[in-house]
Amino acid sequence: ACIKVMDSSTVCDYRMVAYMKEIAKKKKLKTQLEILPAGGTDTAGIQRMNPGGSIAGAISIPTRHIHQVIEMVHKEDVRGAIDLLRLSVETLHNYDWSFR
């Protein structure tokens, strides 16, 4: 699974990135950080939903030949992204979201 740090439209909240990295480390999930100089996701829209902003992050699946007819992913990466998402949602209420 990839943990988004930034793309062309957003910089993810450092607390969300740290939270997902912490979960992945505890559960021994393979992850990599995603930094995209071009392209984007709906993460920016979610961050801007509230006047004061929102804590937002994103999980993605490493892909080869994206947007091509030969696009490929590894099954373990798909499973890892699902597991990271599930664990992140299940333990969201336990994390200290205050500024450090």
How would you describe each model-predicted region?
Residues 2-82, 88-100:
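Active-site-adjacent substrate-binding region
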